Amino acid sequence: ERWAQLLLAAGADEALVMPSAGNPIVFGQKIVDPKAKTVLIYAHYDVMPAEPLELWKSNPFEPEVRDGHIWARGADDDKGQSFIQVKAFEYLVKNNLLTHNVKYIFEGEEEIGSPSLEGFCREHKELLKADVILVSDTSMLGADLPSLTTGLRGLAYWEIEVTGPNRDLHSGHFGGAVANPINVLCGMISKVTDADGRITVPGFYDDVEEVPQAEREMIAHIP
């Protein structure tokens, strides 16, 4: 509800706290021109657990400024960035500088893999329709070096079952002669990547686009 209040105060036409299969999702928008391009801003309001609390110098849920930095749980992931996006939107609205439609979606399950987000997006795809998505959950290379992140790593999960003897075997009689499933699995895992970190699974890179030379050159100039 607090995020919905902030969006309305910043100038949104509407801000809704909407149900999902899990935690509520906040949606807000301001339409300046139905024919204009639309930017959808994604962020998340959930955070990692703050425990152990005794290691904090201040209350993790009461922001405190020390040495020019804001200290609080979520100040860097992702409440701080989310708040900046809202205040930037507020500035554009109040100064009549907003030329594009803006939509916001704040979810509350990013830290556990966003299990409810896909279903919510499918159910409300027309409401969330946009020309570009801006994710406010990335990093900067430095305080004085604004960074535009155009890609992030993904996640993949596999379950591997290695079977061996169907009963206990005496290590003195069979050790070394009969493969231990644990050793076999360790060998498989050790070969998933090579010395340069490239994944060796056949076909893994078949549908992966190469980084364009122009982007490589830009990356090379980053300090």
Residue ranges and their predicted role:
Residues 1-53:
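N-terminal helical capping/dimerization or prosegment-like subdomains
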Residues 4, 83-90, 118, 182-190:
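Predominant activation on well-ordered alpha-helical scaffold segments within soluble catalytic domains
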Residues 8, 94-97, 125-126, 165, ...:
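Generic secondary-structure signature for well-ordered alpha-helical cores
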Residues 76-151:
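Acidic/histidine-rich catalytic neighborhood of metal-dependent amide-processing enzymes
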Residues 141, 150, 171-223:
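Acidic-enriched catalytic cores of C-N bond-cleaving enzymes acting on peptides and small amides
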Residues 147-163:
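Flexible glycine/proline-rich, aromatic-decorated loop/lid segments
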